Amino acid sequence: MVIDAGSSGTRLTLYAPGSDLTASRIFRAPLTTPGLSSFVDNPGDAGPQSVTPLLDALRDQLVTTGISPSDVPIALLATAGVRLLKQTDPAAVRAIFASTQAAITASGMPLRTNAILPDVREAALAWVDANALSGTLDDTAPRVGIIEVGGASAQVAFHSPRPRGPGVVQVRVDGRVLHTVAVSYLGLGSNETRSAMQTRLNGGKPCFPNNATGVNPKFYLAASQRRVASDRADFRGSPCGRTYAAVISDVATTVKEPRIRPQRLGSLPGFSRANFIGLGGVTFAYTDFAIPTTADPRRAL
């Protein structure tokens, strides 16, 4: 069982291992609880408020299916929101994980993992998942590349024809060693990027559409993020796009080798052959703007 402690929320999914590379999803909790990084001021509440409600929903499902809780090991994996928090308040992160561990232990289910998922591993695992589901892990098939936009970070990964090189990592799958370029950019997730754009634009009106009625919604963003009144927003593509590019540039200056700056991705071996798909926030953007999902994100990169 996996607890995905993402920056925008915490979710629980129960899987059953399959005979192939995929796993069957048995159950997904019908609720999303607050992200762990939101408990920076009250870390002791992370377990009771973020993890316990999910475990309660799981326990009800286990009773229905006749599965013993002792047979369901729990892996809690936190991602970029907690990575960011660790940079500024490592003590809070330790307290948050102590709280989540206590909640899992109290559930009677065995604890397998309660930690931050390394950023490059997050990118590589997303790549493996996409190719396993697409049936493209075989050497004879063109492999899928992924562009994943989460709440606090963005990941890019694609097959590398070379065993070594910038950003190349080894991934062991079903007894085979695969090579992939896997990179993660902390700060380029949708929430963090939007916050940075708000700061640069002194309020961000050019990045939101005008809603003259002033209802549904009345405001964009929470008050803590310099919210914008929807009837005063004034979307303008050029200044908004320039601001987004500036935020990407800011993040790029913090990337150190062997990490890859975003501007270099297109020159790496394997990039031009990958069939990219968008995950996370990319999918939401396609839906919101009615963009055909066949659009190739490689062109945007």
What residue spans do the PLM features occupy?
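A short acidic Gly-Thr/Ser loop motif
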Residues: 3-11, 147-153
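Primarily extracytoplasmic ectodomains and periplasmic/lumenal surface modules that are beta-strand-rich
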Residues: 8-9, 19-21, 83
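Helical "lid/coupling" subdomains associated with nucleotide-phosphate turnover
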Residues: 14, 33-69, 75, 81-146, ...
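Conserved ATP-binding subdomain of kinase catalytic cores across diverse folds
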Residues: 30
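Beta-strand initiation motifs
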Residues: 19-27, 165
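Broad, structure-driven detector of short, well-ordered beta-strand segments within folded domains
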Residues: 1-3, 17
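Short, solvent-exposed loop/turn elements at domain surfaces
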Residues: 10, 22, 39-41
